[in-house]
C-alpha cells in the first residue's frame, strides 16, 4: 500500500499549528498531536504502529438541524464519518472531505477547513495491530436535498436530529455543541465561515 506523501505531514503540522482553541483539554491535545507529528515522520500513515492521524467529519444537513452518522461495522456504534489518510490526500481537510463523500455517497459537500475537535483513542486497525487514532474532526455541510447512499464501509447510515442523537455515540454530542457555537459566531459576524467545496 502506498503511503501518504510528505506534503500531508507538513500540512497537518500547519493545520494544527494555525488552529486555536479556548478549551484547555483541546489545547493539550493540539500540543500532543503536534508533538507526535514532530516525533514521527510517518505519523499520517496507517502503518505507523505507535498511532497515526486520522480525519473525521461531522456532517450536518443544509438546515443544520440533523447530522449523518454511520453504524460502524467494527465498533458496532453510531459514529461520525471518517477514516485513514490515503496516498492521494494532500492535507487533513481533503482526507476528511474524501472520507465523508465516500461514506455518505453525497456530492457537493462543503467543509470548514478549521479543525472542530480533536480526540485520541485506542483501536485495533484493519492490520490487526493495537494502535491509537489521533483523530482530527472537521465540520461538513451537505447541500439541500442531499441523498445519502449506504456504502460497504457502513452497516447503516442515518440522519439524526441534533436534539435526538442515539445513545452511546462517543463524542458526537460534544462536536455538535462545538458546531452550534461556531455557527452562532458566524451568524453574528454575518458569514457562514470559511468553506471548501467538495
Model-predicted regions and their roles:
Residues 1-26, 93-111:
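Short N-terminal secondary-structure initiator segments
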Residues 2-19, 131, 144-198:
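Nudix hydrolase/Nudix homology domain
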Residues 39, 48, 73, 80, ...:
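Residue-level signal for pocket-adjacent positions within structured domains
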Residues 79-87:
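Short helix/strand-bridging catalytic loops that position acidic/His residues to coordinate divalent metals
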Residues 86-175:
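Unchanged
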